[in-house]
Amino acid sequence: MALKSYKPTTPGQRGLVLIDRSELWKGRPVKTLVEGLIKTGGRNNTGRVTMWHKGGGAKRLYRIVDFKRRKFDVPAVVERIEYDPNRTAFIALVRYEDGELAYILAPQRLAVGDSVVAGVKTDVKPGNAMPFSGMPIGTIVHNVELKPGKGGQLARAAGTYAQFVGRDGGYAQIRLSSGELRMVRQECMATVGAVSNPDNSNQNFGKAGRMRHKGVRPTVRGVAMNPIDHPHGGGEGRTSGGRHPVTPWGKGTKGNRTRKSKASDKLIVRSRHAKKKGR
């Protein structure tokens, strides 16, 4: 899909660059593969804001996407490529030989009428899924599982991919878009190809209202708040904050390391921060 720019006939059109979605399905999604989506406005079960800058936006239906791809050795044909408001990638509706319908993430170069299949060892072509144990080294993949059978978790956003670079003692080594080199079990599934819609990051929405339609609220600077709301708040007139930049909870926000170690850190061979100074 190409980018589409607009003539500045109004201020909101000036600089507007959007994805040309003219080739996507224009109808409704399959009713049996959608469910209602309740808006949280960024609040958790106690009513407190746990994710800032969320709220409002157009009503959505959640498309149930198959991230597991565990229907082995049953070919499926791509019926259509669809827009999904819940993710940056496009999704593909596939019909299996036994008649079952499912949504999968659409990789680049997947077209209507193409055949896809999941299995222990399949052809290396976009949309086919297999475990790393049956995959040749060097393959570009997406929708990578971290735990066998859990479903794909890595490389699911538009244009992303990982590369299978080696095997080591029952583990597969993969290089992620961030530069991180990590290991996952060879039994983990992955889908061949890079995720569709690679130009997503080149869009310019042109006006605040389009971001509000997407459910994104304004980002307020700490120095513009009151002292009760942020450590940088308050003061007479405009101030610089008066201290090193911190989050609303007082943690350093410009490069300070605040994350705790996780058990899965031992599977990271090379950190995505490896090139940074002092890492």
Swiss-Prot record:
Sorted alphabetically, the keyword list is: Ribonucleoprotein, Ribosomal protein, RNA-binding, rRNA-binding
Q: Which SUPFAM superfamilies match?
A: Nucleic acid-binding proteins, Translation proteins SH3-like domain
Which branch of life, at top level? Bacteria
- The residues the entry assigns to the signal sequence are none
Composition bias (Basic residues) maps to 269-279
Write out the function statement from the record: One of the primary rRNA binding proteins. Required for association of the 30S and 50S subunits to form the 70S ribosome, for tRNA binding and peptide bond formation. It has been suggested to have peptidyltransferase activity; this is somewhat controversial. Makes several contacts with the 16S rRNA in the 70S ribosome.
Which named protein is this? Large ribosomal subunit protein uL2
